Amino acid sequence: MEIKQTNFAIIGLGGRGQGNLGELISIDGVKVVAVCDKYEDRAHRGVEIVKEKTGEEPEMYLDYKELLKRDDIKAVMVATTWITHVRIAVDCMRAGKHVAMEVGGAASIEECWQLVRASEETGKFCMLLENCCYDRNEMALLRMMREGIFGEVVHMQGGYEHDLRDEIGLGRENRHGRIHNFKNRNGELYPTHQLGPIAKALHINRGNRFLTLTSMASKACGLNTWLKNTQGEDYDLADYKFNQGDIVTTMIKCAHGETITLVHDCTLPRPYSRNYKIHGTRAAYNEDAKGIYIDGVTKHEESDWMHSWEPFEKYLEKYEHPLWKTYASESEKHGHGGMDYLVFSAFVESAMYDLEPPIDVYDAATWMAITCLSEQSIAMGSMPVPVPDFTNGMWIDRAPARRSRYNAEEICEEFFSDEEKGE
């Protein structure tokens, strides 16, 4: 496609928003004409980032509603706090702009419906910026699933397992919104990082859907222990009763019988993991083991009754997604190993040409709803709760996602050169 210069804006310039801004303006055709944050120092920093990278000065706003009055902005990226993503995205679409939101869970089911209705009524898209759908391993594994290596997929697992005790515990000092959620909520607060790739693999909202979920939370003591050890016994939150359990486990049942397990684990010491697991009738994958087991292919001694994983690395080159054959050498220059650049490129392409995004409003509503649904389940003693069908029945025979380089459900070979495909 021919590159068309397109005007973008960004709302939210904390740590994530500033990183996003730098990534966004590196994409051909993007012109950031406005930046906004309610904190003046952060908004000023947004202006500086654009000037440093492009030599041009965007307009600065402290009130995003003033920014939305402009008619020269085609699309907006929202990178604010979790509980403000949706309301701002709805206002963007109502103001005639396409919008992409950073990830996070929903505060209520009603706001998910507001998001869907705003997109349907305005014709403007809302894309969730779930970068993990574009991770190198996840895309290779998607290809393996589509080529039948796993057979019929029965169960998938994932999570957000990330030691964020400092980020959460010192959230007031650093103006970080996570702490407010941990003080007041108890649920699967950050579901989409691994649920996104899982949902795409299982054709959720296009031939399959989530039916019910049940969640359970452990006790909460990780943050208190960390705060006492690092800030002292007299720190005012050292004995605060945080509502969020240290470990939250959520199980989801799908319309075609697949099951999903999600784990949220951010307040205990551990290395980072998204705990991705795939189990099918022919093969199994385990992220933490960096391993795969393929029935009849993975070799093991007959005396090895435990059966060993073989390194996934040896399959990566063979099943590499063409996007990564193209961008692998450049990935270290971009955020989160390159997957930020890819999901932002997908957003830019969709906005530039008014195309359906690869992660659409129905995906956003469905994945984000897991947060408030898990809160309900936990509050009711881990009772099962139904997952709304935000497609209003369209999932049954909905058309496949638009084919493109950035399709997150299928590998669209026709959009890649022979060199990109490794031929």
Q: Residue locations for each model-derived region?
A:
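A structured beta-alpha segment of the ubiquitous adenosine-cofactor-binding alpha/beta core
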Residues: 57-75
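Active-site beta-strand termini and strand-to-loop segments that position acidic
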Residues: 250-256, 280
